């Protein structure tokens, strides 16, 4: 197995991190990169230059990615870190002269090394050379690069004092930030928080008639986000999420006051706002669910009352049904009697009228004999009825007399 260079993978992504235009030193470094004199691995020899062509295929995929844009970028050596720090800090005339001398020394060293290395891709880092195989040319390069090392150490000290919130080892993990507008940004954040709080308080004052205020806030003395308040709520309306949200905000405010990093505060505020929105949404949904359950319980109780009343009415109807049938029968009988009485009254009125007419005729013409025809047959039968009764009575007497004679 061929030994690979002992170098961190993050070093490949640290190039062009600041996004600024490079000087002549960077352009020359892309074609002929100087030797890394600050890194001395155990297994590195001069013969490693011959194996660059073979290792380029294996490591070519790592060079196509963009550098990471976060604070965990690790610089491979102090020279790259000095480039990043130097782009953010104002340089003095002495530092400018030192940079120019270092640029010329690196260009000369790269020209000497280009004779030895014929096939080399742009933006390719060479493997460092150990102390055992150190040539006189390399020692000259090492002596010439010392001014750049001093400059990089000065920039490291300045960056360490300007960013106390970061780690004390800038070569391992350093975030290149601008220290100048930090106070202006913090003041702008304070102003935006104050305006947001004023708008929220104005909204709460404009709606005084509401009994329930799901978003009632109280301001803290420090410049922080509003705090969830439980004093304006009733004891029956307070839920576990309200208590959790109030305690969470108090703890978060105390923790935020202890932190000095602006990035951490921004992340904490973002996390706080997202979590608070979710919790407030959950509280509102739970409150709506409670009101719906209460309304549902009322509707169910009303339905039960109406159902009970319906059962009672059905029982009463079953009890009244026999009486209803009897009343219906009586009603039918009365209707029949009424109809028969109406018919009898009509017949009697007609008969009375007939008798009146007959008496009137007899008074007017008493000598005229009565004549009967088929139309007067009912009147003749009615008049002969007592005669027929007398005949039948006589027949009965005759029959009884015959029986007595036979017995003698």
Swiss-Prot record:
Linked residues for Glycyl lysine isopeptide (Lys-Gly) (interchain with G-Cter in SUMO2): 178
Residues where Phosphoserine is found: 102, 105, 110, 114, 130, 133, 135, 183, 187, 222
Motif Nuclear localization signal: chain residues: 293-310
Positions of region (Disordered): 1-218
Bias (Basic residues) ranges: 1-33, 118-127
GO cellular component: cytoplasm; kinetochore; nucleus
Modified residues (Phosphothreonine): 72, 92, 104, 192
Record field: compositional bias (Basic and acidic residues): 94-103
Parts forming coiled coils: 273-350
Post-translational modification: Phosphorylated by PLK1 at Thr-72, creating a self-tethering site that specifically interacts with the polo-box domain of PLK1.
Main location: cytoplasm
Localization annotation: Cytoplasm; Nucleus; Chromosome, Centromere, Kinetochore
Pfam families named among the record's database cross-references: CENP-U (PF13097)
Keywords per UniProt: Centromere, Chromosome, Coiled coil, Cytoplasm, Isopeptide bond, Kinetochore, Nucleus, Phosphoprotein, Repressor, Transcription, Transcription regulation, Ubl conjugation
Ranges annotated as biased composition (Polar residues): 176-186
Oligomeric and partner information: Component of the CENPA-NAC complex, at least composed of CENPA, CENPC, CENPH, CENPM, CENPN, CENPT and CENPU. The CENPA-NAC complex interacts with the CENPA-CAD complex, composed of CENPI, CENPK, CENPL, CENPO, CENPP, CENPQ, CENPR and CENPS. Interacts with MLF1.
Protein task: Component of the CENPA-NAC (nucleosome-associated) complex, a complex that plays a central role in assembly of kinetochore proteins, mitotic progression and chromosome segregation. The CENPA-NAC complex recruits the CENPA-CAD (nucleosome distal) complex and may be involved in incorporation of newly synthesized CENPA into centromeres. Plays an important role in the correct PLK1 localization to the mitotic kinetochores. A scaffold protein responsible for the initial recruitment and maintenance of the kinetochore PLK1 population until its degradation. Involved in transcriptional repression.
Sequence similarity: Belongs to the CENP-U/AME1 family.
Protein's name in the database: Centromere protein U
Organism: Bos taurus (Bovine)
């Amino acid at each position: 197995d061929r030994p690979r260079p002992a170098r961190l993978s993050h070093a490949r992504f640290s190039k062009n991190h600041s996004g600024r235009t490079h000087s002549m030193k960077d352009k020359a470094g892309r074609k002929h990169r100087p030797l890394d004199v600050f890194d001395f691995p155990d297994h590195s020899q001069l013969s490693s230059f011959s194996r660059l062509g073979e290792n380029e295929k294996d490591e070519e995929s790592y060079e196509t990615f963009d550098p990471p844009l976060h604070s965990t970028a690790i610089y491979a050596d102090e020279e790259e870190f000095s480039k990043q720090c130097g782009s953010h800090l104002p340089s003095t005339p002495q530092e400018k002269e030192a940079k120019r001398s270092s640029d010329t020394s690196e260009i000369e060293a790269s020209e000497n090394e280009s004779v030895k290395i014929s096939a080399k891709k742009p933006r390719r880092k060479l493997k460092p050379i150990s102390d055992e195989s150190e040539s006189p040319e390399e020692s000259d390069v090492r002596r010439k690069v010392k001014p750049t090392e001093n400059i990089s150490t000065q920039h490291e000290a300045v960056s360490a004092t300007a960013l106390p919130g970061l780690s004390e080892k800038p070569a391992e993990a350093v975030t290149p930030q601008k220290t100048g507008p930090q106070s202006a940004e913090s003041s702008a954040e304070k102003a935006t928080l104050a305006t947001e709080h004023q708008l929220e308080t104005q909204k709460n004052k404009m709606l005084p008639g509401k009994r329930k205020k799901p978003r009632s806030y109280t301001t803290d003395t420090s410049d922080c986000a509003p705090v969830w308040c439980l004093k304006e709520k009733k004891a029956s309306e307070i839920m576990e999420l309200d208590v959790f949200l109030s305690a969470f905000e108090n703890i978060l405010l105390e923790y935020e006051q202890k932190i000095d990093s602006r990035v951490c505060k921004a992340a904490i505020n973002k996390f706080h706002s997202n979590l608070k929105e979710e919790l407030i949404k959950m509280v509102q949904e739970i409150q709506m669910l409670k009101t719906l359950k209460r309304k549902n319980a009322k509707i169910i109780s009303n339905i039960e009352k109406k159902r009970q009343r319906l059962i009672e009415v059905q029982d009463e109807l079953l009890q009244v049904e026999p009486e209803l049938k009897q009343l219906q029968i009586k009603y039918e009988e009365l209707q029949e009697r009424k109809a028969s009485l109406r018919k009898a009254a009509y017949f009697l009125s007609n008969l009375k009228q007939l008798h009146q007419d007959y008496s009137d005729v007899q008074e007017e013409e008493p000598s005229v004999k009565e004549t009967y025809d088929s139309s007067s047959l009912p009147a003749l039968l009615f008049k002969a009825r007592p005669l027929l009764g007398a005949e039948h009575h006589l027949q009965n007497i005759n029959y009884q007399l015959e029986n007595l004679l036979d017995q003698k």
